[in-house]
C-alpha cells in the first residue's frame, strides 16, 4: 500500500447462518477517539473489540505514539512529524502489521495544499521510502468545497487541504506529482529487493548507494536547496535502475 485515503472498506462473505462475517475488514479509529475518551477508555474499547470480534482487524490514525500502547493494532498511520523508529516498523511488519504516515492541515511540509510547491508531493514518496513506511495517507482525496473549481478554501483550513482532484474526473498538478512520488517509492522498493536477491558485490554496492541516497530524505524540515537535491536523487535513482 503506497497511498490510502481515509476510507476503510470491509469485504464480507455470507456465513452458513446467513449472517455477515468480515473478511480482511478493519474497524478504523481516527485521532479524535483518544482525545475525546482518553487512552485508558480507548484501550478498554479495543480490548472489548478483540474479545467479541477477533476476526476484525483494527486501523488507527495516531498522533500520540499510541502504537506503543496498542501493539496489537493491525494498521497504524502516524502523523508525519511523529516518526516511527525503523526497528518498530520492522517488528510490526514481521507480525504482518502495516505502518504508514499521514499529513493533514497542520503539517507544513511535505504537503499538497494549493499553494504548496508541487515537488513536495514527490518528496512525500521519498520520505515514505527513506523512513521505511509501508505507505502514506493524505487527507483528503475529494472532500470538495462549494466551488471546488474556483476556490479551494474551506473555513480556516489551508487552501486545497480537503481535496487533491476535481469533479468531473479532473486531475491536478498536485495529484500527478504525488503519482510521481509513488512511482519513485515503488521503484526504490523493487530495486532493494532485486539488489538483495542478487547477492553479488555489484548489487551490494548499488544497495549501499541507494541507502545513502535515501538518507537525506527522512526529514520534514526542508533545506534551502531541497528541490535541487530531489531532482539529483531522481537522476541517480534512474541510473541505479539501469
Task: Describe the function of each predicted region.
Residues 1-36:
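N-terminal low-complexity segments that are often proline-rich with Ser/Thr-Pro
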Residues 3, 106, 166-169:
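A generic structural signal for ordered alpha-helices
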Residues 6, 11, 119-122, 174:
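Residue-level detector of functional hotspots within protein domains
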Residues 7, 97, 196-200:
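Residue-level recognition of short, well-ordered coil/turn positions
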Residues 17, 26, 35-40, 44-63, ...:
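Catalytic domains of carbohydrate-active enzymes that cleave complex glycans
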Residues 17, 26, 32-149:
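Catalytic-core regions of glycoside hydrolase
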Amino acid at each position: 500500500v503506497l497511498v490510502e485515503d481515509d476510507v476503510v472498506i470491509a469485504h464480507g462473505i455470507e456465513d452458513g447462518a446467513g449472517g455477515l462475517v468480515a473478511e480482511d475488514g478493519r474497524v478504523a479509529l481516527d485521532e479524535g477517539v483518544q482525545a475525546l475518551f482518553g487512552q485508558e477508555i480507548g484501550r478498554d474499547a479495543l480490548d472489548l473489540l478483540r474479545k467479541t470480534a477477533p476476526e476484525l482487524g483494527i486501523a488507527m490514525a495516531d498522533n500520540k505514539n499510541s502504537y506503543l500502547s496498542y501493539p496489537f493494532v493491525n494498521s497504524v498511520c502516524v502523523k508525519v512529524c511523529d516518526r516511527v523508529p525503523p526497528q518498530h516498523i520492522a517488528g510490526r511488519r514481521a507480525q504482518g502489521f502495516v505502518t504508514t504516515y499521514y499529513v493533514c492541515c497542520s503539517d507544513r511540509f511535505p504537503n499538497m495544499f494549493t499553494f504548496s510547491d508541487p515537488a513536495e508531493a514527490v518528496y512525500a514518496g521519498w520520505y515514505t521510502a527513506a523512513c521505511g513506511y509501508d505507505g502514506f495517507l493524505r487527507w483528503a482525496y475529494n472532500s470538495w468545497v462549494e466551488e471546488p473549481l474556483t476556490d479551494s478554501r474551506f473555513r480556516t483550513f489551508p487552501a486545497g487541504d480537503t481535496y487533491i482532484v476535481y469533479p468531473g474526473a479532473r486531475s491536478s498538478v498536485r495529484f500527478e506529482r504525488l503519482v510521481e512520488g509513488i512511482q519513485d517509492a515503488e521503484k526504490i522498493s523493487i530495486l532493494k529487493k532485486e539488489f538483495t536477491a542478487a547477492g553479488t558485490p555489484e548489487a551490494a554496492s548499488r544497495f549501499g548507494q541507494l541507502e545513502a541516497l535515501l538518507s537525506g530524505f527522512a526529514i520534514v524540515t526542508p533545506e534551502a536547496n531541497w528541490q535541487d537535491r530531489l531532482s539529483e536523487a531522481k537522476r541517480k535513482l534512474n541510473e541505479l535502475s539501469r
